[in-house]
Amino acid sequence: MDLYSTPAAALDRFVARRLQPRKEFVEKARRALGALAAALRERGGRLGAAAPRVLKTVKGGSSGRGTALKGGCDSELVIFLDCFKSYVDQRARRAEILSEMRASLESWWQNPVPGLRLTFPEQSVPGALQFRLTSVDLEDWMDVSLVPAFNVLGQAGSGVKPKPQVYSTLLNSGCQGGEHAACFTELRRNFVNIRPAKLKNLILLVKHWYHQVCLQGLWKETLPPVYALELLTIFAWEQGCKKDAFSLAEGLRTVLGLIQQHQHLCVFWTVNYGFEDPAVGQFLQRQLKRPRPVILDPADPTWDLGNGAAWHWDLLAQEAASCYDHPCFLRGMGDPVQSWKGPGLPRAGCSGLGHPIQLDPNQKTPENSKSLNAVYPRAGSKPPSCPAPGPTGAASIVPSVPGMALDLSQIPTKELDRFIQDHLKPSPQFQEQVKKAIDIILRCLHENCVHKASRVSKGGSFGRGTDLRDGCDVELIIFLNCFTDYKDQGPRRAEILDEMRAQLESWWQDQVPSLSLQFPEQNVPEALQFQLVSTALKSWTDVSLLPAFDAVGQLSSGTKPNPQVYSRLLTSGCQEGEHKACFAELRRNFMNIRPVKLKNLILLVKHWYRQVAAQNKGKGPAPASLPPAYALELLTIFAWEQGCRQDCFNMAQGFRTVLGLVQQHQQLCVYWTVNYSTEDPAMRMHLLGQLRKPRPLVLDPADPTWNVGHGSWELLAQEAAALGMQACFLSRDGTSVQPWDVMPALLYQTPAGDLDKFISEFLQPNRQFLAQVNKAVDTICSFLKENCFRNSPIKVIKVVKGGSSAKGTALRGRSDADLVVFLSCFSQFTEQGNKRAEIISEIRAQLEACQQERQFEVKFEVSKWENPRVLSFSLTSQTMLDQSVDFDVLPAFDALGQLVSGSRPSSQVYVDLIHSYSNAGEYSTCFTELQRDFIISRPTKLKSLIRLVKHWYQQCTKISKGRGSLPPQHGLELLTVYAWEQGGKDSQFNMAEGFRTVLELVTQYRQLCIYWTINYNAKDKTVGDFLKQQLQKPRPIILDPADPTGNLGHNARWDLLAKEAAACTSALCCMGRNGIPIQPWPVKAAV
């Protein structure tokens, strides 16, 4: 996370440069919303007929509160109408008014605001009309909700408290929590807007942290709303600071501390409502008895933003607990930043909050008010104890029993970060002693040895920062002037090591009083081995002293070695990894640039590795025959790079991913080109030779001759599978923590000739699972057709499966599909949106009945996310938990009727579509059968190429996350079909050539103009005129062969995709065995 790597003193600059929105975009969006509000007032919010009058408009959301982040933000435009005389009126007329407002909005946008684009996403909030304003460069956007509302407050003056009747009426309306929050937007906005600018900067910092946590792959829907963190930030500032100028690092530290204490939080304000009115007072008492955390909206007491029963605050708390070692929480001298002190704020070493209540200054204090008894701990309960802080300032989660290994399998998922801090990180005191001892040893050798060193490098886990408590390893590489080549090291090594040992034995006499130096049996010919032992701290370190040839020389940070270094190594005739000591510095630098939390994950993996070795000593392979622990370090870095790349992440997810890769050891192919690469011909041939060797292959990033993957992985794989079902991988709701999406080999590192094997091994779904899914879908479709709308004139005409699963291009793992339900109640395209909530409700009920009444070979789950406009379910393998298909259920108008396979639809279908549509591809679900048939009829090998392209595309989405929307994946499928058709239509083509052709077309996106006429053409005048219009639009153009309104090339970041495509063309996957680039087919970018 970029925030974590920012020094505490630089956070103000970080907020100003990285988080505050661009003024130009803010001003354009403000003008646009102002003009829209004026237009709605003029038109009364309706077109034609007698229109309700707009009483006032209020801008809310983060944009209205002044807490909008750069990039993407939200805004609420609340339209108060005179036709609403009560809260209840809003429900009755909302749909009608929203429909008319959309018409007004579309009419108003006929004259667009320069520099902005307006788009309508899928409408997922029943009480609002949602649209997005995007800058033309696609760097900034604002999600706007247009909300019609009851003007309960009237023209309230600033700072004036609403009448209690406002809230008693709200409570009597029978509303859900926060249902009418829009009515109080003005109060909510004013509550934040009076705050100092720096407090709003702190809010931006907290929100940025929250969004980074969301990017880790956690389900954003399960986390509390970000507005809850805005309120928590204000609470922290009020209780601990209340100054206009303060340290952002201290403020952030305080807010994260509160998040850790979420189970004790009870926060509310009485600036707008209070206990004076009996009805409101009784309601507040009930609210304050809710599960913690409780964070009441200061404008609407029915809205509990904390909602401890619903949101996963523990996920945020877990991340908060693990981030205090980062530079943003360290002062210039390395001292930790302290949090603010105050009532209701966490205290060092305490597990609770002293005073978790926030009151208005004019409100009676708890001591003087009988109304507040409900917020105190229940009778008989004791306040949280406050133990004396230990060395880390926190109580240990697992009692330390001398001589007993901690059972990792029983550590709860959310406690893994603390487990690492308390039990795996080495003692700072012992580390200091070792550093002191090493300095003394090096001084001794420098002053007394005959053979002089040019320089020294510290390696091993100690040098890399991955050393465990209770024992680590250090490599001291002594680069000697007498070695001028790799071959010089062998003949003189024994003599030099004997001299070094003699010097150490004679010179070491209690040089570090707390440490003893011991020489074990010497079993590594190229090194002098000894131990530094601290009896008092019960810790030791194994030290290896290695004289070596300085092959690399003094390199500045980030500089690649001269290719000649490695060409000399390859021609030296060395054994595998024989000269790895010469590259210790590169190895250390490769690891040291990694974030703190990744190193913590490495510690966890190594601790597990040690436990496996210790528990199975004498039962199976000896620990020496296991792969080296360093192989697990590299595998952990590989997992993080490919699956996460965030400074903060879920520790259990990372751990599970590494264990998953261990289980796939027979397919592991892992290497890096940070120090050596395929640009040098000799190195390219060497790497290609390495890639032809049996798996696992885990090449050292510093020494390409050293495959650290050698060893017996079977025992590790068995133990990894056994650990997968233990407590350390179970989330709070009892479900298994899901690993990151990481494969044991990378596309870019796969030779072109091995692409077919890559697809079959890693991309093709399991055939048994696909058969089970198809059988389950057939059962579900039949059930829905027979049982939906039994006592209704509505009939299910047919149910059609769409998406990649239906087309035969699904990828292994988690894929998406559509189940389109064609209904008789829709007689034209524009009716599809009618009765959607009612129809979805009926289909949901029947899906749940099907789930209960039918037997399935796969796990069938209907989504619990009860959005009245969206319905989804998933089918998951019972035996392979990473294999699943997520289905969206989509009601649709049967525009095509019973179409005979291979026949063309009537041109009238497309004439009606052209006259009906408002947004591109709006009714594409009606053409699902045609979309499916267009792909499913293609040769098997072309579908394999489509899988390869989709896999490449998904890797690109990880890289470009947060930088704008890439073109839709379906567009890449069509581009692949086009490349094959224009490239010769050979059913047994060269996979690398096909892939290379698609990449070439992506780089030529500015010229792309692709369409088909198998379903529609220009013979009908209306359709022909429309096609001409479509084809005259800016490139790229990729028209959906089933739906001519759908241009899959429009309004997306093709430039990002093109950049990745250009990079891929020089990778091994696009290069022949002789190092010559694969050539694309001769395909033009336009039809």
From Swiss-Prot:
It is found in: Cytoplasm; Nucleus. The gene is OAS3. Mg(2+) binds at residues 816, 818, 888. It catalyses: 3 ATP = 5'-triphosphoadenylyl-(2'->5')-adenylyl-(2'->5')-adenosine + 2 diphosphate. Residues 411-742 are annotated as: OAS domain 2. InterPro entries: 2-5-oligoAdlate_synth_1_dom2/C, 2-5OAS_C_CS, 2-5OAS_N_CS, NT_2-5OAS_ClassI-CCAase, NT_sf, Polymerase_NTP_transf_dom. Its main location: cytoplasm. The record marks 155, 244 as: Interaction with dsRNA. Residues 12-57, 186-200 are annotated as: Interaction with dsRNA. The modification Phosphothreonine is found at residue 365. It comes from Homo sapiens. OAS domain 3 is catalytically active. OAS domain 1 has no catalytic activity but is essential for recognition of long dsRNAs. Produced as a latent enzyme which is activated by dsRNA generated during the course of viral infection. Strongly activated by long dsRNAs at least 50 nucleotides in length. ssRNA does not activate the enzyme. Residues 750-1084 are annotated as: OAS domain 3. ATP binds at residues 804, 947, 950, 969. Residues 344-410 are annotated as: Linker. Its cofactor is Mg(2+). This is 2'-5'-oligoadenylate synthase 3.
